[in-house]
């Protein structure tokens, strides 16, 4: 009876003992981790408004993922290869699920979301306090009552999101370095670029799902089910609107946990691809045994770890590749993270629509670029030198094309007393704001309240009171204000809730912006595979896992963590009006100075990415100096067969005896 069960168990293990099955499981792991990451990036604006925090704190929350990753990335990358790599990937996916669940907790621990407003949703009487009434005292000032102020502790709930994102970053750590090294170790060298290309294309399902789920949740009110949405005086286009961000994180938690299950069934090692087809499994077993014996003869795992690190630090091509990666991430991360905010404030669309358009236009072009690039690398057998040249040319083309976005400008939304005068004359960003005018001085209005209305004269006002409106009709978001003294010059003196919409010319420029984005993403993804192959092939086989981990470490330390924080702080400097908390403290930014925001959003990343050109030329020069036998086939390129530089020779001499012992094994493996 035990024999059939044993056969079933062996058959089940054999089903998972294939590199292509592992590739499929790794694709789903990439999809789940990218789904969580993309969804987080689409919800940053919602979190900013939910917790009434600045953009710099939002950047800190976003960077906390990299902090978690940074804590363990180097040790996972190196020591993970000594352990069971598939199981470590499975544990990482489960930990990511836990992090997503913790992120969603504040919704269940906080009370209902209260947006800044003075308007009662059912008010339609001319005596309401938010309207213009002569000789009235300001009874709606921000409270200074300690009992009320203590409620503002709810805004500190963003710390749960911070901690959850750190845990999510820790869980994500083993997936890329251990997954890529597992494929590199057990796949044919000529199939490796294709498999990585398939992986890059397959993982694009993650952004597609994330960009679909983001707008869906953003259009649902955060407290849906517990409030009557008909009574809301805000819509998804309002900068105070908060979508149901917590729903998506619960979905991501479940997906990550389910994704972890298959990895617990993969073996620690696989037969080298091609050997099992030739019946040469015994040769692979001997090679594995020889490799294990060599490891046992090492003086110690810690010493080997530091020797490999020294090897990598003495590799000039590797270090230049790391430098270009850091500069690239500094530029690209800022563009990706804050693109929804830029589209919302520059082109006047809702956050949900911005997220949907980003996914619709960018995901297909990136997928096509990855697939075409991987296919070309395999079929044409691009050499290392040609791959470096192709990557640099494509990257420079993408950078130059992105500069065209500077020409696509929309006018700043006219807001009386903020961006324009009450006569409609545009004001400079540096000018002192004058919220009061002759038409509303008698109303004794609050000047910090953000309840924007759009007059039929095309000018927006910060509140119905500042527009001089004396009467309101209707309820909820359909409320109309009448008898507005500041609008009477146009012949009709009514206003509706919300900022005025941008003109059709701005909508056309949005389309041009998105089309340019499509081509930029396509060129960027085309350059990724050849650039990544240069990075992989500049290391020895046994150094790749640690090299990938070190690269990820530096990218997170010098780009992933600081970039969203300093960029968010710079964006805060372009804020025109801050929301107000109950105790009078500033909350989330309600509107930005569009021209300054545009110059910052497009200019700083362009400068950072443009600085990559210099180290890229040095990489090309170093590659051309290398004497690579048989550089006609990319599968034959390994640094161990090249002529080392003077600096590499100096570093190698310190552990020459160790290298001699393993030289025969290394050549057999290569």
UniProtKB/Swiss-Prot annotation:
Compartment annotation: Cell membrane
Q: Which residues carry this modification: Phosphoserine?
A: 634-635
- Membrane topology, from the record: Multi-pass membrane protein
**Stretches in topological domain Extracellular:** 41-59, 112-155, 225-242, 334-353, 406-513, 572-605
Q: Where is the composition biased (Basic and acidic residues)?
A: 640-670
Where in this protein does the record put region Disordered?
Answer: 633-670
An example Gene Ontology cellular component term from the record? Answer: plasma membrane
- TM region positions: 21-40, 60-80, 87-111, 156-184, 204-224, 243-267, 312-333, 354-377, 382-405, 514-536, 546-571, 606-623
Instruction: Tell me which residues bear Phosphothreonine.
Output: 632
What family classification does the UniProt entry report for this protein?
Answer: Belongs to the organo anion transporter (TC 2.A.60) family.
Q: What is this protein called?
A: Solute carrier organic anion transporter family member 1A6
Gene designation per UniProt: Slco1a6
């Amino acid at each position: 009876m035990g024999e059939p069960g044993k056969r079933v168990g062996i058959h089940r293990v054999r089903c998972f003992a294939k590199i292509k099955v592992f590739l499929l499981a790794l694709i789903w792991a990439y999809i789940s981790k990218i789904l969580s990451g993309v969804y987080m990036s689409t919800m940053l604006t919602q979190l900013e408004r939910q917790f009434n925090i600045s953009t710099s704190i939002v950047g800190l929350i976003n960077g906390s993922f990299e902090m978690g990753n940074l804590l363990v990335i180097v040790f996972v990358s190196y020591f993970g290869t000594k352990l069971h790599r598939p199981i470590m990937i499975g544990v990482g996916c489960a930990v990511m699920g836990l992090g997503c669940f913790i992120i969603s907790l504040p919704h269940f621990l906080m009370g209902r979301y209260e947006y800044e407003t003075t308007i009662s949703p059912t008010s339609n009487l001319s005596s309401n306090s938010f309207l213009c009434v002569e000789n009235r005292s300001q009874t709606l000032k921000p409270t200074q009552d300690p009992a009320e102020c203590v409620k503002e502790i709810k805004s500190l709930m963003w710390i749960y999101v911070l901690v959850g994102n750190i845990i999510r970053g820790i869980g994500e750590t083993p997936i890329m370095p251990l997954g890529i090294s597992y494929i590199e170790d057990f796949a044919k060298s000529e199939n490796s670029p294709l498999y990585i290309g398939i992986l890059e294309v397959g993982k694009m399902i993650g952004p597609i799902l994330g960009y679909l789920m983001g707008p869906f949740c953003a259009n649902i009110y955060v407290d849906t089910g517990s409030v009557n949405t008909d009574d809301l005086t805000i819509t998804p286009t309002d900068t105070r609107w908060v979508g149901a961000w917590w729903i998506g994180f619960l979905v991501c938690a479940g997906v990550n946990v389910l994704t972890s299950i298959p990895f617990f069934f993969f073996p620690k090692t696989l037969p080298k691809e091609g050997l099992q087809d030739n019946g040469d499994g015994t040769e692979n077993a001997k090679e594995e045994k020889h490799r294990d014996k060599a490891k046992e003869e090492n003086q110690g795992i810690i010493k080997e770890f530091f020797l490999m690190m020294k090897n990598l630090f003495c590799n000039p091509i590797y270090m230049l590749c790391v430098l270009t990666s850091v500069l690239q991430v500094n530029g690209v991360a800022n563009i990706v993270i804050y693109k929804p905010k830029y589209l919302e404030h520059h082109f006047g669309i809702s956050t949900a629509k911005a997220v949907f358009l980003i996914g619709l236009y960018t995901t297909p072009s990136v997928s096509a670029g990855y697939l075409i690039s991987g296919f070309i690398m395999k079929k044409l057998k691009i050499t290392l030198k040609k791959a470096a040249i192709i990557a640099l040319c494509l990257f420079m083309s993408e950078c130059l094309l992105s500069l065209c976005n500077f020409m696509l400008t929309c006018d700043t939304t006219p807001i009386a007393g903020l961006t324009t005068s009450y006569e409609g004359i545009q004001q400079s960003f540096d000018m002192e704001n004058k919220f009061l005018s002759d038409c509303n001085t008698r109303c004794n209005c609050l000047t910090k309240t953000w309840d924007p209305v759009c007059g039929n004269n095309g000018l927006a006002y910060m509140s119905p009171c500042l527009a001089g409106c004396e009467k309101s009709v209707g309820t909820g978001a359909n409320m109309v204000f009448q008898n507005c003294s500041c609008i009477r010059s146009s012949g009709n003196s009514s206003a509706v809730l919300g900022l005025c919409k941008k003109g059709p010319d701005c909508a056309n420029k949005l389309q041009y912006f998105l089309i340019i984005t499509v081509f930029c993403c396509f060129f960027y993804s085309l350059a990724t595979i050849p650039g990544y192959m240069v990075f992989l092939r500049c290391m020895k086989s046994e150094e790749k896992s640690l090299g990938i981990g070190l690269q990820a470490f530096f990218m997170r330390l010098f780009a992933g963590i600081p970039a969203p924080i300093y960029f968010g702080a710079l964006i805060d400097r372009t804020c025109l009006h801050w929301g107000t908390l109950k105790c009078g403290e500033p909350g989330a930014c309600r509107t930005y100075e569009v021209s300054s925001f545009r110059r910052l959003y497009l200019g700083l990343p362009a400068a950072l990415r443009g600085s990559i050109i210099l180290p890229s030329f040095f990489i090309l020069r170093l590659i051309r100096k290398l004497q690579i036998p048989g550089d006609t086939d990319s599968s034959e390129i390994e640094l161990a067969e090249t002529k080392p530089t003077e600096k590499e020779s100096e570093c190698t001499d310190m552990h020459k005896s160790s290298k001699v012992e393993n030289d025969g094994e290394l050549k057999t493996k290569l």
